């Protein structure tokens, strides 16, 4: 039993306990060693890995339905863009769009959706000590009737690694030895951040194309080996 014998000690204990309460929840889908399991499940069966009620936002129709529920209608991209980045009013119009949309979505139930999205990835460096592979991940750009949609994790594990079973490990090793890619899909699930949940911008690759970035607080990461890599 803990005995607190002085005002200073009591203050210190309270401080330490409050610090523990403020530690953020870790991203799940890891074993006791901190390594994720390499999955071979079909993307159509992702529900089995995710919490009940998760909205899987992979298909264009699902992404557009999410945007309709949260934002109502697409912005008038042509008006916001004007004459482009060199237009004197371009930045102000884009700022106003983001500000007005932030206000309009306040209290919208879709802000509380638990959702999942995917980014493409590849397995690369093998660590013989942990028998795991590093996962290199890049963003995915989804073409929709609203513009380009890129889901953006608020934070992402800086050293994502997965451990395949023995059969998969042998297959992946042979593929990499032949300089073939071992492609994966990185599934991220979580909820939108409470403020500035959606960022509106323009594509840096295609002139005048609108870019929508939902910002997600990631709570779960799953790595799925692509079928042709099995």
Segments and roles (model prediction):
Residues 11-22:
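Bacterial N-terminal signal peptides
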Residues 2, 19-21, 209:
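Residue-level detector of alpha-helical hydrophobic segments embedded in or interacting with membranes
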Residues 27-230:
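OB-fold and OB-like single-stranded nucleic-acid-recognition modules
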Residues 1-13:
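Bacterial N-terminal signal peptides that target proteins for export
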Residues 5-6, 18, 25:
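Serine residues within intrinsically disordered or low-complexity segments
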């Amino acid at each position: 039993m803990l005995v607190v014998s002085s005002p200073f000690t009591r203050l210190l204990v309270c401080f330490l306990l409050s610090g523990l309460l403020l530690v953020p929840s870790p991203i799940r889908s890891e074993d006791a060693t901190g390594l994720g399991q390499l999955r071979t499940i079909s993307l159509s069966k992702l529900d089995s890995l995710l919490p009940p009620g998760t909205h899987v936002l992979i298909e264009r129709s699902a992404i557009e339905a999410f945007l309709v529920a949260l934002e109502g209608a697409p912005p008038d991209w042509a008006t916001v863009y004007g004459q482009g980045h060199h237009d004197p009013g371009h930045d102000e119009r884009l700022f106003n769009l983001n500000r007005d949309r932030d206000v309009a979505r306040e209290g919208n139930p879709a802000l509380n959706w638990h959702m999942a999205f995917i980014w493409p990835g590849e397995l690369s460096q093998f660590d013989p000590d942990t028998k795991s592979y590093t996962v290199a991940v890049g963003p995915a750009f989804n073409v929709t009737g609203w513009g380009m949609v890129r889901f953006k994790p608020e934070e992402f594990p800086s050293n994502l690694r997965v451990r395949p079973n023995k059969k998969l490990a042998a297959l992946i090793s042979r593929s990499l030895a032949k300089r073939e890619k071992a492609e994966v899909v990185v599934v991220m699930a979580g909820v939108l951040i409470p403020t500035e949940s959606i960022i509106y911008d323009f594509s840096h690759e295609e002139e005048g194309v609108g870019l929508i970035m939902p910002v997600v607080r990631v709570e779960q990461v799953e790595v799925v080996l692509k079928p042709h890599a099995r």
